[in-house]
Amino acid sequence: MAAQRLGKRVLSKLQSPSRARGPGGSPSGLQKRHARVTVKYDRRELQRRLDVEKWIDGCLEELYRGRESDMPDEVNIDELLELDSEEERCRKIQGLLEACANPTEDFVQELLAKLRGLHKQPGFPQPSPSDDPSLSPRQDRAHTAPP
């Protein structure tokens, strides 16, 4: 009998309206968690990278004004940072800007200077479709399974 009373008392406390609310008074009964963002990378480095990306976008829009269809889809900062020398970076950038009718020398030199202050982001390598020797240039990677 005492066990029944104890059980009823515990059950009534669990079902009481004050217990139905979680900590912080949320009616859902779920604990309210403090949102905490952890960043693996240094915030300053990320801001520098973002600033360079915005600068690149602005310069490309200016260089390709009126000929946006010729503008490169992307100037991959990490790909440029992976190259061993500044000469290789320069050639890569000039290759991306082949279709540009406006002079690009100043842009290339400024971009090289900005790249000197950046570091490659660690992460998982994302191979491009051109890195896969089993695919010919005309094959669509999404619709073709490797042999």
Curated annotation (Swiss-Prot):
- Which segments show compositional bias classed as Basic residues? 1-11
Q: What does this protein do?
A: Inhibitor of PPP1CA. Has over 1000-fold higher inhibitory activity when phosphorylated, creating a molecular switch for regulating the phosphorylation status of PPP1CA substrates and smooth muscle contraction.
An annotated GO cellular component of this protein is: cytoplasm
**Family of the protein in this entry:** Belongs to the PP1 inhibitor family.
Source domain of life = Eukaryota
- Per the record, the gene is Ppp1r14a
GO aspect biological process, one term:
cellular response to xenobiotic stimulus
Question: Where on the chain is Phosphoserine found, per UniProt?
Answer: 26, 128, 134, 136
Region Disordered, as annotated, extends over 1-36, 118-147
InterPro entries per UniProt: CPI-17, CPI-17_sf
UniProt name for this protein: Protein phosphatase 1 regulatory subunit 14A
Q: What is its main location?
A: cytoplasm
Taxonomic source organism: Mus musculus (Mouse)
Arranged from A to Z, the UniProt key words for this protein are: Cytoplasm, Phosphoprotein, Protein phosphatase inhibitor
